[in-house]
Amino acid sequence: MPRKKTFVDNQFEGHPLCDVPREFSYNYIRTIVDLVSTMTERHSKVLVARFDLRYPQGYEADGTNQDFSAAMQAVCRDFSQKKYDPQYVARREQQSSCNPHYHVGFALNGNKKRSIPDLRSTLEKHWSEQLQIPLSEVQEKALVYPCNRAPDGSHRSNGRMINRNSLDASEQKEESIRQLSYLGKVDEDDVTDSATRKFFASQFYKDYNRTMTLKRYWAERKADASSGSSIGSI
């Protein structure tokens, strides 16, 4: 049976994606849903937020994804040191501009990280360092855009906290998937070369499996220790 490449709908396996049907990449949406599901299984609270990373007008990038990849490595290294468990999905797009831009969706341990503005500040810092331009330029030109404006210019919220123990947990999760689903759309106007990578995701599958293996290991160690203690007291 051939593997699905794209589909046209406004939902995916019961998860609402948009108001009207549009074309999505099956693999991209699958990854987005799995990211949110995996993180909400791993943490009781998950902070989800979207940002766009852009180049300043007139900047001569080399056309590769090197700037983006290096900046994301620095961001994730920074967040990992603070125990935020940073995971992300990202999409490269390029239309009429000389340079690409990147849509990024983050999912972090919400028990450790709760501030979206602080998340943006960290992204701005590492994006400015990678492009070797002043931080003030990144901030003034909104080169790390918080995705808080609707197409008509009105304000819209960016990001949310998914609280697994909340009565609204299911709704919070669905809204997060819906927001990130923008990264899974098919854009006919994208001029990115077919040989250039357009979709990115952190190793959340690998990290999750490692975390669960360690949890089982320590649970077994604790159970064995408890059993040994009980035997010794008889």
Name each region found by the language model.
Residues 1-43, 110, 115-234:
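Catalytic "initiation/cleavage/transfer" segments centered on a nucleophilic residue
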Residues 33-94:
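Signature for HUH/AEP ssDNA processing cores
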Residues 88-112:
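Histidine-centered divalent-metal-coordination microenvironment in nucleic-acid enzymes
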Residues 4-22, 60-76, 104-106:
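Charged, low-complexity, helix/coiled-coil-prone segments
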